Swiss-Prot record:
InterPro entries: AA-Vitamin_Transporters, EamA_dom. It is a multi-pass membrane protein. GO terms for cellular component: plasma membrane. Disulfide bonds: none annotated. This is Uncharacterized transporter YvbV. It comes from Bacillus subtilis (strain 168).
Length: 305
């Protein structure tokens, strides 16, 4: 895929961080009208089916007989566990606080990439990892005093771990599958597991099909999930993966501000301090070592010759 023009890259990045930022308060508000697993299953199913339609012209790249295990594992980690745990967890914690813990994911991904992908671990990255753990500890500390739900914190961490594992798994296996089919099928397959779990443990009749719920459901399904993931893979495919990673810290910031304005969630000192540590951590984890920078310069010079 060709490198995108700077203006288009900036617009796509802005769209992505805004959509994924407002997703948290919107999801929190929608849970007043629906049980969590059914809500997670319905929104991911709609998003997945929309992307299947987009992917159909690339049906020759599917190769389902050879690649179905990749789609299955990715669906379980990135969709069933990630969306399932986060949607249940939003019942226990404010949306802004929950998103701040979930976006500890880039830090966890740094650890898992080092362990399983052999990616380098240098001083700045180690400092970033330590700050990230400290940030989650600061945010979570109030839970041990009874101020916030420990269950909610654990669900947020579980969501972050499943997303980090899923992302590392996609990095390891991504070259063997088509990126659009990967996200379309992982959403569709993952949604089936969520809906089965929802039908088993929840009641479909408990969903209140009100205008606010339908509006939130469609907005999240279309803009946050379907278009959000399409934009994500467009940016990654054009060589902007590092930019996407470095801008992820804006997502919990937008979530916290939006949750404070629309859901009247409090901005506590521990939340702001923990978020600052996590933001700093993400920035440090996404910095490149001198060797990586030198290698990148060498590649660019060769390309220019």
């Amino acid at each position: 895929m060709k490198q995108l023009p700077k203006t288009r890259t900036a617009l796509l990045l802005a769209f992505l961080v805004i959509m994924w930022g407002v997703n948290w308060p919107l999801s929190k508000a929608a849970l007043a009208y629906s049980p969590p697993l059914l809500f997670a299953g319905i929104r991911t199913l709609i998003g997945g089916l929309l992307l299947v339609i987009v992917a159909l012209p690339r049906i020759h790249k599917l190769r389902l007989k050879e690649t179905w295990p990749i789609y299955l594992v990715s669906a379980l980690l990135n969709i069933t566990l990630f969306y399932g745990l986060q949607t249940i967890g939003l019942n226990y914690l404010p949306a802004g606080l929950f998103s701040a813990i979930v976006f500890f994911q880039p830090v966890l991904m740094g650890v898992f990439s080092w362990l399983w992908l052999g990616e380098s671990m240098f001083v700045m990255k180690v400092i970033g990892l330590i700050l990230g753990f400290a940030g989650v500890a600061v945010i979570s500390a109030a839970g041990f005093g009874g101020h916030i739900s420990v269950i909610g914190v654990l669900l947020a961490l579980g969501s972050a771990v499943s997303w980090a594992l899923g992302t590392v798994y996609m990095k390891k296996t991504g070259s063997r599958v088509d990126s659009i089919w990967m996200v379309a099928l992982q959403l569709t397959i993952g949604s089936v597991f969520l809906l089965i779990s929802g039908f088993w443990t929840e009641s479909f009749s408990a969903i209140q099909w009100t205008a606010p719920f339908i509006t939130s459901l469609l907005f999240i399904s279309v803009f946050v999930i379907a278009l959000g993931w399409l934009v994500f893979f467009t940016l990654v495919g054009s060589g902007e993966a590092s930019k996407v990673a470095s801008y992820t810290f804006l997502i919990p910031l937008i979530s916290i501000v939006a949750s404070s304005i629309f859901l009247h969630e409090p901005l506590t000192l521990s939340l702001l301090a923990g978020l600052l540590l996590i933001v700093t951590s993400i920035c440090l984890v996404n910095t490149k070592s001198k060797a990586q920078k030198a290698a990148a310069i060498g590649i660019n010079e060769k390309a220019a010759q």
